[in-house]
Amino acid sequence: MKTSMQSKLDQLTTRLAELNDLLSRENVTADLDQYRKLTREHAEIGPVVEHYAQWRQARADELAAQELLADASMRDFAEDELRGARDRMGRLAAELQTMLLPKDPNDERNIFVEIRAGTGGDESALFAGDLLRMYLRYAERQRWQVEMMSESPSDLGGYKEVIVRIAGYGAYSRLKFESGGHRVQRVPATETQGRIHTSACTVAVMPEADEIGEVEINPADLRIDTFRASGAGGQHINKTDSAVRVTHIPTGIVVECQDDRSQHKNKDRALKVLAARIKDKQYHEQHAKEAATRKSLIGSGDRSERIRTYNFPQGRMTDHRINLTLYKLEQIMDGDLDELIAALVSEHQAELLASLGDAE
């Protein structure tokens, strides 16, 4: 293990002891924002320090085995112990290197998932509904909480646009690679000739700001309109102007929320989504230059980029960024995304390791 890496791990060990002390104090929950930051940091570095403790134990075992080699009667045993200790050290060092990769500061945040129907008309809207169900089923498997923020249903079912909030530890780290264009190939229910149609939707996964104040929004830059909420087909669901449309004038970002009968709640939801969209826009602008110099296979989050194809006649899903094809489409659409997400995370980590190697 490199000295620089060991030094970093020693620092984390010291920091974990400090966090344990801070979190054991009686007034630790007096400042909830600070408490969240401390618990988040503790959860992040705890497993790293535990791995490092195992590496140090393996190192101690290696030194003990080396001392035993001098005793002829213990040599065979010592050689076995030495091999085992070095194998453990090598495995743990590789795992620690991955664990020490630069962290996305948004990884542990809650998220907003925005799905928009694209080319394909009604079939695209139906597929948007299928994608929403896929993510909701995945969230259910993770025991995450889901809240509908905004929906624009289509006449035949599905959605022209839908936004949900998913709350759960690590939600962004697991679903951030879903941003982009999703293409579906299947025979629509309305197709009488049995022809396969191709439709598309775009997905945007945005980290939630810890609080709206985290993103600077000047009230003077907002235009807030109220209007009468309506359901699919234009039927009025109430007779008051409870729906809210918030426009951020500098960026042109518009958010509508009408799912609640309370205008106040709709406005609050709209501002949360707006803060997330502005944060997302700032994040992508900040990383645009970096992306131009080092083209990343995944993680660009470009909504115009086609990332995946779902072919129903063949029962397959292909992720074009990593050339992964899985013939388990039914399970995937039911929220079984673990294999896919693990492959995307693994590729992302490999890219980070490669970029660190280039920098050295």
UniProtKB/Swiss-Prot annotation:
Q: Which GO MF terms does the UniProt record name?
A: translation release factor activity, codon specific
Primary location: cytoplasm
The UniProt entry's GO CC annotations, sorted and at most eight, read: cytoplasm
Modified residues annotated as N5-methylglutamine in this record: Q235
Q: How is it modified after translation?
A: Methylated by PrmC. Methylation increases the termination efficiency of RF1.
Which cellular compartments is it found in?
Cytoplasm
Q: Does the keyword Protein biosynthesis apply?
A: yes
**Matching InterPro entries, A to Z?**
PCRF, Pep_chain_release_fac_I, Pep_chain_release_fac_I_sf, Prokaryotic/Mito_RF, RF-1
Keywords from UniProt, A to Z, are: Cytoplasm, Methylation, Protein biosynthesis
Superkingdom as given in the UniProt entry: Bacteria
- Please name one Pfam family that this protein belongs to: RF-1
Q: What does this protein do?
A: Peptide chain release factor 1 directs the termination of translation in response to the peptide chain termination codons UAG and UAA.
Matching HAMAP family: Rel_fac_1 (MF_00093)
Q: Which family does it belong to?
A: Belongs to the prokaryotic/mitochondrial release factor family.
Q: What is this protein called?
A: Peptide chain release factor 1
Source organism per entry reads Burkholderia pseudomallei (strain K96243)
Q: Which gene encodes it?
A: prfA
